[in-house]
From Swiss-Prot:
Taxonomic placement: Eukaryota, Metazoa, Chordata, Craniata, Vertebrata
The protein, known as: Gametogenetin-binding protein 2
Principal cellular location given in the protein's record: cytoplasm
Gene, per the UniProt record: Ggnbp2
Entry coiled-coil feature ranges: none
GO biological process: cell differentiation; labyrinthine layer blood vessel development; labyrinthine layer development; negative regulation of cell population proliferation; negative regulation of gene expression; negative regulation of receptor signaling pathway via STAT; spermatogenesis
Induction line: By dioxin (2,3,7,8-Tetrachlorodibenzo-p-dioxin).
Length: 696
C-alpha cells in the first residue's frame, strides 16, 4: 500500500516530487505526499515463464530501435477509451481523468517506468524499453492485473459505484482498525501535521456535539468555558473545579490558534476511545454541571474531530491508490497492445489470421481424411465389379492367333462344303431327329467376353446370350448346350472327326424364301445388335438360295453323318464394319472332352428315314419344325451349371433386354407369321406351324 511521506505546505507550489509520488489532497488546509514503494513494481524479482520469455525476446529483437520507440507511445485518447470501457464506476473514471490531467500539467514521474508527456502522450522510460526481460515483466506480469483489480473492487448494484466513491462513505461509522492502518502508513511529519488541530475546526465540532445531545444552557456554557481554557483564552487558575490532568498531552498556540496533540499512539488511542460511544449511535440528554465534566466533553469532541480527520485521510489514501493503479495498468495495457500490433505488422500476419489458418488447416486435414475414405469405398466397389466381371484373359497376340485359326477353319469348311462364296462367319446348326441337342463348343473370343464359367471349356464365352421366359424364378440360359445359341450363330459345335458343312448366302432384300431357323436367327441377331454393337436393323438374311442348298443337304444321302441322319441348317451373319470377320465357329481339336460335350455324346441318337419331305404326304418319317424344336431342348439337370452370381451379373448387365423382352417376342412373332403367310404356297409345313403358333 502507498505511504504518506511528506506534507505540502501552503505556498510550496513546486514541491520536488520524486518517482512514484503524487499529491494527496485531504482538505483545504492539508495536502500530503503519497508515494508508492518500489516493491509494488518489482521488474527483476519475478519468476518468468522460460518459453514465453524466449518468444517475447525473439519478438522484441525483431523490432528496430525506431520501430520500438514508435510502438511504445500511446495517446490519451486510447487510454481514456479503454477506461470508459473497462471501469464502470463514475467516481473512478473521474479520478483517473483528474490524475492524468495533473500529470500532464506537472510532468511528475508518478507512473514510472511510464512517463506522461506534455501533449498527453504516454510512453516508457528508455531503460525499460530496451530491456526485454523488464518489458516482459511489465506487460505480462503486472499488466495482467488490470482485469483482476477491476473485478475485485466492490460495487453498488444500484449505480455501479465502488465503496470508496459511494455517498455512504462520508457518513460517520463506528471506530475500527482503519485509523491504526493509516496511522502506521504516515511518516512522523505527516503524524505531526495530522494532530495539529485548528481551533476553529474544533469549535465547529463542539457546537455540533452540543446541539446533538441537547445540552442545557448552563451545561453548554460550562463546556464552552472548558474549551476556552484549552485554547488559552481563560486562566485555568481562576476556574473552580478545573483538573489540569485532563488536558495533559495537549498544548495550545494562542497566536496561531492551534492545538498540538501528543503524537504517541497510546494517547491517540485514548482520545479516540472517548469518542467511540459517540460513533456507536444514539442520542441522549447530556449534562455538564462542573468544569471537570465539561473538560471531558471537550476531550470527547477532540477525539471525534481527530477520528474524522484520520478517517478522511484513510479514505483519500485508498481512493487515490486505486486511481493510481487504474491509470498505471491502463497505460501498461495500452502499451502492450501497441507493441503487439507493431510486431504483427512486422511479421505481416496477425493473430486472427494465424487462427484462421489453423482452422483452415484442420478443415483441409478433415477433408483429406474424408476423401481417402471415399477413395477406399470407390476402390472396394471397383474391385468388387472387377471380381464380378474380370478382365480379358486373352492378350492381343492370342486374339490374333485365334483370328487366324478361325479364318483357316472357315476356308476349310467352305471348301469341304463346296461353296463358292467368300469365307464369312457362319454357324452350322445340327438338329437331330431325336432328343439330341446341339453339342457345339463356342469360341473363346467370340464376343470378347472375359469370363470363363465354372464347368465350361476355356474356349466358351461366359456371357449368356439367351433370355429367360420370366424375370423372377427362372435362370437365364447359357450358350453352351443351347439350341437357340446354335441357331443364333454364337455357339460352335464340332464333334470328333466331323467336318462342318458351312454355307454362305449373299444378302438380298427380295430374294425368295428363306429357312425358318435362318430368318429367326437373323431377327434375334439384329435385336441383340441394337443393344450391344448397334448394328443396322435392316440386315436380315434372305435365304432363297440357301433353301435349295438345304434341300440338297436333306435329300442327298451323301451329306448325312455316319452316326445318324441329321439336318443341316446354316445361318449366315451379315458383314460387319470390321475389316476382320469375327468367327463364331471354332473347333475343339486335340483337347479333352468337355462335360457338356460328353453329355451330348451320351444322349441316344435315333435314325430317321433316308428321305425327308416337308410335304403333307411325307409320312411318319417326316417331322414338323415344332417337333424338331421340342425334341432339341435338353431336359437334363446336369447341364444347369450356371452359378447364381453369374446369373445376377448377367441380369444386371442386360436390364434393357429384360425391359423390352415382351416387345421383342411380339415383334418376332409378327415377323414369323408374316413370313409363313407369304410362303404358305411353297412350304406346307409353314401352314402347320402358323396354326400351332396361333393356337399357342
Amino acid at each position: 500500500m502507498a505511504r504518506l511521506v511528506a506534507v505540502c505546505r501552503d505556498g510550496e507550489e513546486e514541491f520536488p516530487f520524486e518517482r512514484r509520488q503524487i499529491p494527496l489532497y485531504i482538505d483545504d488546509t492539508l495536502t500530503m505526499v503519497m508515494e508508492f514503494p518500489d516493491n509494488v513494481l518489482n521488474l527483476d524479482g519475478h519468476q518468468n515463464n522460460g518459453a514465453q520469455l524466449k518468444q517475447f525476446i525473439q519478438r522484441h529483437s525483431m523490432l528496430k530501435q525506431q520501430d520500438l520507440s514508435i510502438a511504445m507511445v500511446v495517446t490519451s485518447r486510447e487510454v481514456l477509451s479503454a477506461l470508459s470501457q473497462l471501469v464502470p464506476c463514475v467516481g473512478c473514471r473521474r479520478s483517473v481523468e483528474r490524475l492524468f490531467s495533473q500529470l500532464v500539467e506537472s510532468g511528475n514521474p508518478a507512473l514510472e517506468p511510464l512517463t506522461v508527456g506534455p501533449k498527453g502522450v504516454l510512453s516508457l522510460t528508455r531503460s525499460c524499453m530496451t530491456d526485454a526481460k523488464k518489458l516482459y515483466t511489465l506487460f505480462y506480469v503486472h499488466g495482467s492485473k488490470l482485469n483482476d483489480m477491476i473485478d475485485a473492487i466492490p460495487k453498488s448494484k444500484k449505480n455501479k459505484r465502488c465503496q470508496l466513491h459511494s455517498l455512504d462513505t462520508h457518513k460517520p461509522k463506528p471506530l475500527g482498525g482503519c485509523w491504526m492502518d493509516v496511522w502506521e502508513l504516515m511518516s512522523q511529519e505527516c503524524r505531526d501535521e495530522v494532530v495539529l488541530i485548528d481551533s476553529s475546526c474544533l469549535l465547529e465540532t463542539l457546537e455540533t456535539y452540543l446541539r446533538k445531545h441537547r445540552f442545557c444552557t448552563d451545561c453548554k456554557n460550562k463546556v464552552l468555558r472548558a474549551y476556552n481554557i484549552l485554547i488559552g483564552e481563560l486562566d485555568c487558575s481562576k476556574e473552580k473545579g478545573y483538573c489540569a490532568a485532563l488536558y495533559e498531552g495537549l498544548r495550545c498556540c494562542p497566536h496561531e490558534r492551534h492545538i498540538h496533540v501528543c503524537c504517541e499512539t497510546d494517547f491517540i488511542a485514548h482520545l479516540l476511545g472517548r469518542a467511540e460511544p459517540e460513533f456507536a449511535g444514539g442520542r441522549r440528554e447530556r449534562h455538564a454541571k462542573t468544569i471537570d465534566i465539561a473538560q471531558e466533553e471537550v476531550l470527547t469532541c477532540l477525539g471525534i474531530h481527530l477520528y474524522e480527520r484520520l478517517h478522511r485521510i484513510w479514505q483519500k489514501l485508498r481512493a487515490e491508490e486505486q486511481t493510481w493503479q487504474m491509470l498505471f495498468y491502463l497505460g501498461v495495457d495500452a502499451l502492450r497492445k501497441s507493441f503487439e500490433m507493431t510486431v504483427e505488422k512486422v511479421q505481416g500476419i496477425s493473430r486472427l489470421e494465424q487462427l484462421c489458418e489453423e482452422f483452415s488447416e484442420e478443415e483441409r486435414v478433415r477433408e483429406l481424411k474424408q476423401e481417402k475414405k471415399r477413395q477406399k469405398r470407390k476402390n472396394r466397389r471397383k474391385n468388387k465389379c472387377v471380381c464380378d466381371t474380370p478382365a480379358s484373359l486373352h492378350t492381343a497376340d492370342e486374339k490374333a492367333v485365334s483370328r487366324e485359326k478361325e479364318t483357316d477353319f472357315i476356308e476349310n469348311s467352305c471348301n469341304a462344303c463346296g461353296s463358292a462364296e467368300d469365307g464369312e462367319t457362319c454357324v452350322e446348326v445340327m438338329v437331330t431327329s431325336e432328343n439330341t441337342s446341339c453339342t457345339c463348343p463356342s469360341s473363346g473370343n467370340l464376343l470378347g467376353s472375359p469370363k470363363i464359367k465354372k464347368g465350361m471349356s476355356p474356349h466358351c464365352n461366359g456371357s449368356d446370350c439367351g433370355y429367360s421366359s420370366s424375370m423372377e424364378g427362372s435362370e437365364t440360359g447359357s450358350r453352351e448346350g443351347s439350341d437357340v445359341a446354335c441357331t443364333e450363330g454364337i455357339c460352335n459345335h464340332d464333334e470328333h472327326g466331323e467336318d462342318s458343312c458351312v454355307h454362305h448366302c449373299e444378302d438380298k432384300e427380295d430374294d425368295g424364301d428363306s429357312c425358318v431357323e435362318c430368318w429367326a436367327n437373323s431377327e434375334e441377331n439384329n435385336i441383340k445388335g441394337k443393344n450391344k454393337k448397334k448394328k443396322k436393323k435392316s440386315k436380315m438374311l434372305k435365304c432363297d438360295e440357301h433353301i435349295q442348298k438345304l434341300g440338297s443337304c436333306i435329300t442327298d444321302p451323301g451329306n448325312r453323318e455316319t452316326s445318324g441322319n441329321t439336318m443341316h441348317t446354316v445361318f449366315h451373319r451379315d458383314k460387319t464394319k470390321d475389316a476382320h470377320p469375327e468367327s463364331c465357329c471354332s473347333t475343339e481339336k486335340g483337347g479333352q472332352p468337355l462335360p457338356w460335350f460328353e453329355h451330348r455324346k451320351s444322349v441316344p441318337q435315333f435314325t430317321e428315314p433316308t428321305e425327308m419331305s416337308f410335304g403333307p404326304d411325307s409320312g411318319k418319317g417326316a417331322k414338323s419344325l415344332v417337333e424338331l424344336l421340342d425334341e432339341s431342348e435338353c431336359t437334363s439337370d446336369e447341364e444347369i451349371f450356371i452359378s447364381q452370381d453369374e446369373i445376377q451379373s448377367f441380369m444386371a448387365n442386360n436390364q434393357s433386354f429384360y425391359s423390352n423382352r415382351e416387345q421383342y417376342r411380339q415383334h418376332l412373332k409378327e415377323k414369323f407369321n408374316k413370313y409363313c403367310r407369304l410362303n404358305d404356297h411353297k412350304r406346307p409345313v409353314c401352314s402347320g406351324w402358323l396354326t400351332t403358333a396361333g393356337a399357342n
